[in-house]
Amino acid sequence: DYFDPKLKTEGIKLNISNWRRPAPNTIPWDSKAAGLYMICTLSKHEAERQGYSESLMLDHEGNVAESTSANIFFKDEKGEFHTPIADSFLNGITRQTVIEIAKSMNIVVHERKIKPEELSTFVGCFLTGTAAEITPVSQIAENKYKVCDRILNLSESYGKLVRKKKAA
């Protein structure tokens, strides 16, 4: 597992990186091999030095982008999900799959620009990625989130789908 399995139910903690993702016109951002690993590695190591598991990356405009290794989603009080528009980071296969699963569960998904100031308005948060699968987030900087049933149910649905594909 990418994160400690215990954290899959408790949630991980993220800081907010001082480094930003570069502007889309400066690097081929929609590829894993685009050379962005250095910024993400520096950010993750700094987060770990501060006692966090991960780091939230902002884009070149200061909007929420993703973590150093996974895409990010937020849950609002109505139970709807919000995720940044994939215009400066890789639109991961896990992210796309989670959006499809959420919609099949009648969960509204908003793909939009998310300002860091909005982090305090959300009640839930989770990361998605090949290694992370669906990992709940309990805190970003001073903002705390609940690991709720909606996120755990989504994680269970994703796990069933992945295991079914692996068995086929």
Model-derived segments and spans:
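Helix-start/capping segments and mature chain N-termini
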Residues: 1-168
